[in-house]
């Protein structure tokens, strides 16, 4: 329906309601249906609220709905429909639009709707309309619960909502232009409520225990009734002017008179007897112009005091996001009869309704029966009525419901939550700041009421006050609250009134706390601090054990005897041990030193058989370089090698031992359970006051002091008292030595009405005198005026610069002697080029005289000029670039000359080189030495494909892609992928499966040994299920892995299991909105099945069963023919087990090969193959190739 048709239908519908003639409204026969049509139109209006605007422009509420409401009340269906339509029409504009629109066009519609709402409010300001509503509400409340229907409850709620909506409409200040003691539209509305008796019904709903379901509606209406009022003014209505009020008014008039007299004197000085056409020009000595000369002044001398270099300059525009928050609350004094009515309403409300209503509202809030942010009305009512009770006849029993520790805790929790939300929800920061202000006012009134109870003549009231104060001052949260509020104060969101209330509340709290401490003598308070676990100090030295060389020599005979027994009786030797950690992030090639450390630990612990088993296992894993002995080593040589390992200082990583893993887990659990450590200590008021000696807090006080003319006398007193506590009480006058504050003092002292601010003037003179006394001793104090200072700078200004360093001399590191520097230089030059070790750790292992830290050694190396920067010694993750020594270059040249005619030059060099480097580093060095001219010369040479070999039974052996030697395809790889081994871990999961297949199988085997077989089966089934779904649906999307059992959930939290997931290409949760690990969309169904197959324990066991018997130890590995025969035997065995003929297998292989896309990328892991080949070569087992390479299928876009 377009806009034109909507206008026509709205016009027809409004005309069908009826007409007003001579004060009597004549309704049409289909009036009820027309009202329902209007409700339906409002339900379907657009975002500009066009229907609402057209009805407001037609004044449908003033001309039709109000007359129907007042004259046709007996027609109940029509009356209910009109009430329902009026509730919709008077809905606040903020609820209609969600918030104040920022777009200019939408803001125009917002302001238009607001204008119509203000017209509705003016139309309702009549006794007749509220009289009908009051009578209807009275009749409905007379019905008992057994007679009241659901329609009656709906009508009660709608009437309360209608009253709420009318009172919620803000006043149009520009249109009304009302002053104090003048009747505004809001005052007329309140008077109509009073005359109609609606206020009595609100009091009844507040006090009745049977009508508690309307408590939040009633509280919201009452808060809107007193929106522009102040409790102190209402409490003093009709009691005459008090002496204190008269003295305050006289002081304000005296200030105005003094300023007016000063202005008259200034104007008199400016009036000259002669004209100023021949006044002349003057030079202002000491005031420089743009150049080096003095300023030339062309005006009269009487204008000299108003001279400024900023005259004529364009004022600097403050960005909108940095502008100070504006005051939104407007306080005005209503007409006398309205104030008298409101005062009587407050008194009766406190007498009969406050405690039951606040109890019911608190119950709704705690049971979450209220709407969002309804607690703000609760805190407003608490602040307003407790202040009214204090200003009138103070009776603590009238507000006993909200005078408890639970209320303090509730307000403090909301206040903390509001400022935390203000920091996180930046878009709604202004709204959170307003709620924060309401909570602060409630907290202020709670403290003021408790303070007033101290002066009550009743002993029971004073005892209650003492108990409350004892609990408040004991808890740390209440003491830290004001410090946190000052730190989080932001002028962009908090108006000046918030800062004023915060300063006054802090003043009251400190005054109560100081008085309480003096009366008690000593006060025990609660102290909370976060318990931080100190990391275990691990020795940075190379030797982790404290045995001297002599002790090690004495230990060796016993170890040698155990080793001889193991050699004579093989049954005494232990089973082989895995010498490396397969789940570690450190590559296996780099774990050789750690394996040697484990051997040394076994020897020092007296476990010679375990050390021997580790040595033999490490020899199989790392045969290169004969670091753990040659493959044909004799038992005697093994003993000598173990003796060398025992006496050699080895570098150790700063990690806890395996035996302490359980203790660490227990400590982590204790740390989670005991995050905060609670203790008690004796309270020191001065120590607490020192927490306020901060530049952030002082700047907030100075900001409020700038408006000292607009501040009340009490506010200025609170500012002066706090600054005096910091300056005189703590002896930190230098904290206030700031140029902007001195400019403010200058303006204060030159104010004509300075006599009215005696306290501020006295304090300003005191601070300025202290500054000049310090400046006579410390000339740098003038420069310090430009900066805000903390307590450390204040101490240096007053006690001398460098006093902080002298105070902490006991914590300084000892000086380096010339002998230590010479030893440091010698050690650094000797070990800086040694690969595979940290030069700083090696130096620390040899520095025995004075214990040094790593940081001290590094900084002294830089200071001595041996190193250029500290960054040279930073521990980098991954493989570090190690310089090639001359011997290593010669070895590389020898190996190249030896294997230059072989099919795989680079592979042979990688197998036989002593110092292990990545393929990319070896290739780069070969190019740098000029041994090869281009990388292509190092590619593995492809052999000519021969006719397919026949099996023993005469059948052809199919050659699947997974059976091919991955090294043959090495030349098809990109250079970066085939050579840079370091980047394999950083590849995506789809590109790194080939290199991670073997490590995934090893991880799966270790996880099965730990008892995680069931989670592995669940993971495998999830991968297969995802592969089936992707084949059926044809589309791929990330699939979460949701553990449904407790065992699977614990496995997902296991670090080793997570490492396996990463190896398989499953990605962890990427953001705060994701909880589960996900199978990426880029993995195809074929890849998922291959990954699942790598987890199959049965397949691994079958492969191990089919492996031939080990051969003679010491052989370097099977030949190419032996390897081919082993592969064929393995394939035929698999066929016999699966019952699959060779023809079917060949067809299946051909289908898989032909169905592959055009773009194929083959990834392999030469390093892992070489390692496995060496391991099997040492043990004499023929190497059987498993699936080491996968086809990564890339879809063409």
From Swiss-Prot:
Region spans: Required for homodimerization and for interaction with CRY1 and CHEK1: 1-309
Pfam families per UniProt: TIMELESS (PF04821), TIMELESS_C (PF05029)
Phosphothreonine: residues carrying this PTM: 1086
Required for nuclear localization, as annotated region: 1079-1197
Record keywords: Biological rhythms, Cell cycle, Cell division, Chromosome, Developmental protein, DNA damage, DNA repair, Mitosis, Nucleus, Phosphoprotein, Transcription, Transcription regulation
TM regions (residue ranges): none
Feature: compositional bias, Low complexity: 986-999
Tissue-specificity statement: Predominantly and robustly expressed in proliferative organs (spleen, thymus, intestine and testis) compared to those more differentiated such as kidney and liver (at protein level). Expressed in all tissues examined including brain, heart, lung, liver, skeletal muscle, kidney, placenta, pancreas, spleen, thymus and testis.
Stretches for region DNA-binding domain: 810-949
Entry GO CC: chromatin; nucleoplasm; nucleus; site of double-strand break
Modified residues (Phosphoserine): 281, 1071, 1084, 1165
Cross-referenced InterPro entries: Timeless (IPR044998), TIMELESS_C (IPR007725), Timeless_N (IPR006906)
Stated induction or repression of this protein's expression: In retina, expression exhibits a circadian rhythm in the presence of light/dark cycles. In the suprachiasmatic nucleus (SCN), isoform 1 exhibited 24 hours oscillation, isoform 4 is constitutively expressed. Shows a circadian expression pattern in the intestine with peaks at ZT4 and ZT8.
Region (Disordered): 647-674, 943-1002, 1088-1197
Gene Ontology BP terms: branching involved in ureteric bud morphogenesis; branching morphogenesis of an epithelial tube; cell cycle phase transition; cell division; cellular response to bleomycin; cellular response to cisplatin; cellular response to hydroxyurea; circadian rhythm
Single GO MF annotation: enzyme activator activity
Compositional bias per record (Acidic residues), positions renumbered to this chain: 656-673, 963-985, 1099-1109, 1143-1153
Assigned protein family: Belongs to the timeless family.
Written domain comment of the UniProt record: Residues 1172-1189 comprise a putative nuclear localization signal; nuclear localization is required for the regulation of period length of the circadian clock. The DNA-binding domain (residues 810-949) binds to both single-stranded DNA (ssDNA) and double-stranded DNA (dsDNA), and has high affinity for DNA sequences rich in guanine that form G-quadruplex (G4) structures.
Function according to Swiss-Prot or TrEMBL: Plays an important role in the control of DNA replication, maintenance of replication fork stability, maintenance of genome stability throughout normal DNA replication, DNA repair and in the regulation of the circadian clock. Required to stabilize replication forks during DNA replication by forming a complex with TIPIN: this complex regulates DNA replication processes under both normal and stress conditions, stabilizes replication forks and influences both CHEK1 phosphorylation and the intra-S phase checkpoint in response to genotoxic stress.
Record text on subunit structure and interactions: Monomer. Homodimer or homomultimer. Component of the circadian core oscillator, which includes the CRY proteins, CLOCK or NPAS2, ARTNL/BMAL1 or ARTNL2/BMAL2, CSKN1D and/or CSNK1E, TIMELESS, and the PER proteins. Interacts directly with PER2; the interaction with PER2 is via its second PAS domain. Interacts directly with PER1 and PER3. Interacts with CRY1. Interacts with CRY2. Interacts with CHEK1, ATR and ATRIP. Interacts with CLSPN. Interacts (via N-terminus) with TIPIN. The TIMELESS-TIPIN heterodimer binds preferably to guanine-rich quadruplex-forming (G4) DNA structures.
Name of the protein this chain belongs to: Protein timeless homolog
Natural source organism: Mus musculus
Gene from which the chain derives: Timeless
């Amino acid at each position: 329906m377009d806009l034109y048709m909507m206008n026509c239908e709205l016009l027809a519908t409004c005309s069908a309601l009826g007409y007003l003639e001579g004060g009597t409204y004549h309704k049409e026969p289909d009036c009820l249906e027309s009202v329902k049509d209007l409700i339906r139109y409002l339900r379907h209006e657009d975002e500009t609220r066009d229907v609402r605007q057209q009805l407001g422009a037609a004044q449908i509420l003033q001309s039709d709905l109000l007359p129907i409401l007042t004259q046709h009340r007996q027609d109940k269906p029509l009356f209910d429909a009109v009430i329902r339509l009026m509730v919709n029409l008077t809905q606040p504009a903020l609820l209609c639009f969600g918030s104040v629109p920022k777009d200019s066009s939408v803001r125009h519609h917002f302001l238009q709707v607001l204008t119509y709402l203000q017209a509705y409010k003016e139309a309702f300001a009549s006794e007749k309309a509220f009289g009908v509503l009051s009578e209807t509400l009275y009749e409905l409340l007379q019905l008992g619960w057994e007679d009241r229907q659901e329609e009656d409850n709906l009508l009660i709620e709608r009437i309360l909502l209608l009253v709420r909506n009318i009172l919620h409409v803000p006043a149009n200040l520009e249109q009304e232009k009302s002053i104090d003691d003048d009747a505004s539209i809001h005052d007329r509305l309140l008077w109509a409520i009073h005359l109609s008796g609606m206020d009595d019904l609100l009091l009844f709903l507040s006090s009745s225990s049977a009508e508690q379901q309307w408590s939040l509606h009633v509280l919201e209406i009452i808060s809107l009734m007193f929106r522009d009022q102040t409790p102190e003014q209402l409490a003093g209505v009709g009691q005459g002017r008090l002496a204190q009020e008269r003295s305050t008014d006289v002081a304000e008039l005296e200030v105005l008179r003094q300023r007016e007299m000063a202005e008259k004197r200034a104007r008199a000085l400016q009036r000259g007897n002669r004209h100023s056409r021949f006044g002349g020009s003057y030079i202002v000595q000491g005031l420089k112009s743009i150049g080096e000369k003095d300023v030339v002044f062309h005006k009269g001398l009487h204008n000299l005091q108003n001279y400024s270099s900023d005259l004529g300059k364009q004022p600097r525009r403050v960005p909108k996001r940095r502008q100070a928050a504006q005051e939104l609350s407007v306080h005005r004094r209503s007409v006398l009869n309205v104030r008298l009515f409101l005062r009587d309403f407050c008194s009766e409300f406190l007498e009969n309704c406050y405690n039951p209503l606040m109890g019911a509202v608190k119950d709704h809030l705690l049971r979450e029966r209220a709407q969002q942010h309804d607690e703000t009305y609760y805190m407003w009512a608490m602040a307003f009525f407790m202040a009214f009770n204090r200003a009138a006849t103070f009776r603590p029993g009238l507000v006993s419901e909200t005078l408890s520790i639970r209320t303090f805790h509730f307000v403090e929790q909301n206040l903390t939550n509001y400022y935390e939300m203000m920091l996180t929800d930046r878009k709604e920061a202004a709204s959170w700041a307003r709620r924060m202000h309401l909570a602060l006012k409630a907290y202020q009134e709670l403290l003021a009421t408790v303070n007033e109870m101290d002066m009550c003549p009743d002993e029971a009231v004073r005892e209650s006050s003492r108990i409350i104060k004892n609990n408040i001052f004991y808890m740390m949260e209440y003491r830290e609250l004001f410090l946190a509020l000052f730190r989080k104060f932001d002028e962009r969101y908090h108006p000046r009134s918030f800062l004023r209330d915060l300063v006054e509340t802090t003043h009251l709290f400190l005054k109560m706390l100081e008085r309480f401490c003096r009366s008690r003598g000593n006060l025990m308070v609660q102290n909370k601090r976060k318990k931080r676990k100190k990391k275990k100090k691990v020795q940075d030295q190379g030797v982790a054990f404290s045995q001297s060389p002599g002790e090690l020599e004495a230990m060796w005979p016993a170890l040698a005897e155990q080793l001889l027994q193991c050699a004579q009786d093989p049954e005494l030797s232990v089973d082989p041990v895995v010498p490396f950690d397969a789940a570690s992030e450190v590559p296996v090639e780099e774990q050789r030193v750690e394996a040697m450390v484990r051997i040394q630990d076994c020897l020092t612990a007296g476990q010679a058989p375990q050390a021997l088993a580790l040595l033999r296992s490490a020899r199989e894993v790392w045969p290169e370089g004969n670091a753990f002995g040659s493959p044909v080593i004799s038992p005697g040589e093994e003993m000598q090698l173990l003796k060398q390992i025992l006496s050699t200082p080895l570098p150790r990583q700063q990690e806890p031992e395996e035996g302490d893993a359980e203790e660490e887990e227990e400590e982590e659990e204790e740390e989670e359970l005991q995050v905060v450590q609670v203790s008690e200590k004796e309270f020191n008021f001065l120590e607490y006051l020192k927490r306020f000696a901060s530049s952030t807090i002082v700047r907030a006080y100075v900001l409020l002091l700038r408006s000292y003319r607009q501040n009340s006398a009490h506010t200025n007193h609170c500012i002066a008292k706090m600054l005096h506590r910091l300056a005189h009480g703590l002896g930190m006058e230098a904290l206030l030595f700031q140029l902007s504050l001195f400019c403010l003092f200058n303006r204060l002292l030159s104010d004509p009405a300075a006599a009215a601010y005696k306290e501020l003037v006295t304090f300003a003179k005191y601070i300025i005198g202290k500054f000049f006394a310090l400046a006579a001793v410390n000339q740098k104090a003038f420069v310090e005026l430009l900066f805000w200072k903390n307590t450390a700078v204040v101490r240096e200004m007053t006690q001398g610069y460098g006093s902080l360093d002298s105070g902490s001399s006991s914590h300084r590191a000892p000086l380096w002697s010339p002998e230590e520097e010479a030893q440091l230089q010698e050690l650094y030059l000797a070990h800086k080029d040694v690969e595979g070790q940290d030069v700083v750790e090696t130096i620390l292992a040899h520095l025995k005289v004075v214990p040094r830290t790593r940081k001290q050694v590094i900084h002294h190396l830089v200071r001595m000029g041996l190193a250029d920067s500290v960054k040279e010694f930073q521990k980098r993750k991954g493989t570090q670039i190690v310089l090639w020594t001359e011997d290593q270059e010669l070895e590389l040249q020898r190996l190249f000359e030896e294997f230059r005619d072989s099919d795989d030059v680079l592979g042979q060099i990688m197998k036989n080189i002593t110092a292990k480097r990545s393929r990319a580093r070896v290739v780069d060095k070969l190019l740098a030495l000029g041994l090869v001219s281009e990388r292509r010369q190092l590619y593995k040479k492809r052999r000519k494909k021969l006719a397919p070999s026949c099996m023993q039974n005469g059948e052809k052996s199919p050659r699947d892609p997974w059976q091919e030697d991955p090294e043959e395809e090495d030349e098809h790889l990109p250079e970066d992928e085939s050579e840079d081994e370091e980047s394999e871990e950083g590849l995506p999961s789809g590109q790194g499966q080939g290199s991670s297949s073997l490590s995934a199988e090893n991880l799966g085997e270790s996880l099965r040994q730990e008892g995680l077989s069931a989670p592995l089966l669940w993971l495998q089934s999830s991968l297969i299920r995802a592969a089936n779904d992707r084949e059926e649906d044809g589309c791929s999307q990330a699939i979460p892995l949701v553990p449904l059992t407790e065992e699977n959930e614990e496995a997902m939290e296991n670090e080793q299991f997570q490492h396996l997931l990463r190896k398989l290409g499953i990605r962890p949760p990427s953001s705060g909105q994701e909880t589960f690990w996900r199978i990426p969309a880029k993995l195809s169904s074929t890849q998922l099945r291959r990954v699942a197959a790598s987890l199959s324990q049965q397949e691994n066991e079958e492969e191990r069963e089919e492996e031939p018997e080990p051969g003679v130890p010491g052989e370097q590995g099977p030949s190419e023919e032996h390897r081919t025969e082993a592969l064929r035997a393995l394939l035929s065995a698999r066929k016999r087990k699966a019952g699959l003929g060779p023809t079917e297998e060949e067809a299946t292989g051909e289908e898989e090969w032909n169905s592959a896309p055009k773009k194929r990328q083959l990834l392999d892991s030469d390093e892992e193959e070489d390692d496995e080949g060496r391991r099997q070569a040492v043990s004499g087992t023929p190497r059987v190739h498993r699936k080491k390479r996968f086809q990564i299928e890339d879809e063409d876009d």
